[in-house]
Amino acid sequence: MERTRSKPVRNLPETIHSLLGLKSHMTSDWVKSVCNIAKNTSSTSKKEEDDFVSVDLQSIRDQLSALTVQVNDQNKLRRQILNEFLDLKGNIRVFCRVKPLGATEKLRPPVASDTRNVIIKLSETKRKTYNFDRVFQPDSSQDDVFLEIEPVIKSVIDGYNACIFAYGQTGTGKTYTMEGLPNSPGIVPRAIKGLFKQVEESNHMFTIHFSMLEIYMGNLKDLLLSEATKPISPIPPSLSIHTDPNGEIDIENLVKLKVDDFNEILRLYKVGCRSRATASTNSNSVSSRSHCMIRVSVTSLGAPERRRETNKIWLVDLGGSERVLKTRATGRRFDEGKAINLSLSALGDVINSLQRKNSHIPYRNSKLTQVLKDSLGQDSKTLMLVHISPKEDDLCETICSLNFATRAKNIHLGQDESTEEQAKKEAVMMNLQKMMEKIEQEREMSLRKMRNLNETLEKLTGKPHVIEEEEKDVVREVIHVTPKKPRNKSRRASDVFPSFMRPTASSNRRLSGADFSVTPNSSSFKSRRNSMISVRAESACLPVKKKKNRFDSACDSSDRSVSKSTSIMRQNTADDATVYSQDISECDIKLVVSEHKPKPLQMGPGSATKSRSNISNFEKDVMQKIGGTEFSRINSWLRSQSENRSYVLDKTQLPATHFLENLNRSLEKSPTQSFTTEKITGNELEGIEETKTNETVVNPTLMLKKLFELQCLCSAEEEDQILSRFPIPGYEDDDESRYPPILENDGFSQHIDNEWFGVNNYSADWERDSPATIPLLECEPDLKQLLPELGLDRSLKPRGLAVAEGAAPPLLRAQETLGERGKGPTFMQKLQALCFRILLGLGFMDVGFGNDFFNGLTK
């Protein structure tokens, strides 16, 4: 074996030389010729393969074009047959659904029914029969109802307008028929799901938009624009209705969301249902107090066989048609029921005019008929489901509902037909239905072939076959859900500056360009009610070419945006319990009266300087925070109390002398303390701001005790301590009994008292400040000589403590003027105040609160 291995090694040089000799016989032309042969062979095979693929592609495209034409013809034929079928049934088809009886209700109801008739047993010998296109028995299911409605959904794809609405009294099952339950969906989810199914089976491109609104007391509200709010929150204004040049109804500023699947519409529907107006009535604990309307718009640009490029279907849940005599409603419930019945009556008038083919149709008598104008007449398809109750207690409402349905039945056909004509019509409808089913089967086969060819084409070319259509920019409304901003508790920088350094209202208006001044960092004040964070949806039109987010930025509008909210101010009575649907103020104004309660200062012999400095600092702080004109807080408090005389503290009259004696006793125990009025300059007041929040804060009226503590610390005792020593017979000692009642939930008054808030054009009328009189000088003539020296002569005039500007006694002058004087005038001022307190304690003077004031508290 070793020899065999060594033999190739010895022959290796010979082998290499032989290979080199073989290479010497080859030339460069031979190499080029081999390369050319290889290139020609590959190009020929590639060309043959490309020719084969191109032939297949062309064949597939031809087949797709032929199938497209075939499907279009089938759609046109199906649309014609369906239109004939619906015309034979009538432009407005009226169904009746009988509510099943409960387990505890009567077993023998006065209502009997079959598949087409409803029989009302009025007495033992008298009965009345009502004819319908279809009567659904109490044991009928949601599937049975939708089976009759499905042809109308198909006509929507063909470009026809449609309207389906539920009619009947409250509690007969209208909402159940329209909405249903999770395990038994109603017409709304089934119709929308069927609409998307028809779109998927079609060979055209469709765009679907969803809108939802309600008609509450004659006003149109967009349910997708805002969630359910409290009565004090602003709601959008009533939407306006317009008619475009093509005769189509257009609702201005109505949010129109572009949707791509059923789940998106379902989410939007749940959002809209939360904003509906519902309330408790005698007929139902959760009664719908408005008409809920759902609009689904369908647009297809590349379908010439359609009736319209854009059509719509309305799904309407009408309000309860029960009489006010049954509900015994009052107040807001009465107004709601009246508005519902008026709109339903207008709907009946429109249907009656269509039945008689009058030249004038009264669409403008109600917002409901204006909105449904293009869905009730002409070539629209309308279905009305009348809901009745078989209970004997609801017999009157049942008869009213059946009479209304009779007016709407057979508008196109006119008079009732004979039995033979009706049998012939039913036979024709059966033939048309069979033809339509056959065409739909052929159309389904053609669509299946088209899908298979598209898959093959996608494998060959890498992209599917797309029907060429003009690509246009879509203007969509983007919904921005903006939560309420968190509260900003920081003080504004302008609050620490004097009034003359703060910007005026006119300068703010010039800088901002707005009609009113809005503070950029205004703080949010707490409301009287604990409210949840409200969410608002604002729309903006943005031109985009490609959709980024399906739900967040998918709405379509013709270059519109949602208008700003305006509303009305109204008092909320106990009857105004409707969810969200309360009137509120057009401009939210926050009125905050800040109260400063410094601790009482003990005026000892060695603390006069310290007390004076504290009072001076306190007055300076007040001067920086509050601006206004000179006024008397005591008379302002009197004026506010005289305005609130409508409140009753107790049924018993309070004796005025009793309070005067208590007040004099309390003043006798604090002889070293004084009280002064203040002179306030400036034209701004902290706490009065015009903001854009939805909540209002109204502080209770300041009591006399708080005014004394605020300005002069006249008494070291609290008012509750004083009142506790002098209990009133028959008067309970609680927080509510000590003070006059304040505004809670009864309403809100925008009245701003000029005396409190320092209006610029305020002029103090000191001649009418206080109704109290002091006949002290008439009783004690010897005091007339002493009081002018003390500067107290003017304070004893019939106006009590109300002093005129420029003539105030020294003890009632502002503290800022006292700070500029020397020790002598200051000592005289304190001496005068001491004399004044002594006179008050001895009973020679009073504070000006006469019997009229205390009598007014009990009126």
Swiss-Prot record:
Amino-acid positions noted as binding ATP in the UniProt annotation, renumbered to this chain? G168, Q169, T170, G171, T172, G173, K174, T175
- Which intervals of the chain are annotated as region Disordered? 511-530
Which SUPFAM superfamilies does this entry report, sorted A to Z?
P-loop containing nucleoside triphosphate hydrolases (SSF52540)
The UniProt entry, under Pfam families, shows:
Kinesin
Query: Polar residues bias: where?
Result: 518-530
Which keywords does this chain's UniProt record carry?
ATP-binding, Coiled coil, Microtubule, Motor protein, Nucleotide-binding
Q: Which GO terms describe its biological process?
A: microtubule-based movement
PROSITE patterns in alphabetical order? KINESIN_MOTOR_2
Coiled-coil ranges from the UniProt annotation: 422-463
InterPro entries the UniProt entry points to? Kinesin-like_fam, Kinesin_motor_dom, Kinesin_motor_dom_sf, P-loop_NTPase
Gene Ontology MF term list:
ATP binding; microtubule binding; microtubule motor activity
The answer to whether keyword ATP-binding applies is yes
Residues forming the Kinesin motor domain are: 91-411
Q: Name one GO cellular component term.
A: mitochondrion
Q: Give the matching Gene3D superfamilies.
A: Kinesin motor domain
Source organism, top-level taxon:
Eukaryota
Q: Which SMART domains match?
A: KISc (SM00129)
Q: Which PANTHER family match?
A: KINESIN MOTOR DOMAIN-CONTAINING PROTEIN, KINESIN-LIKE PROTEIN KLP-3
What family is it from?
Belongs to the TRAFAC class myosin-kinesin ATPase superfamily. Kinesin family. KIN-14 subfamily.
Q: What is this protein called?
A: Kinesin-like protein KIN-14T
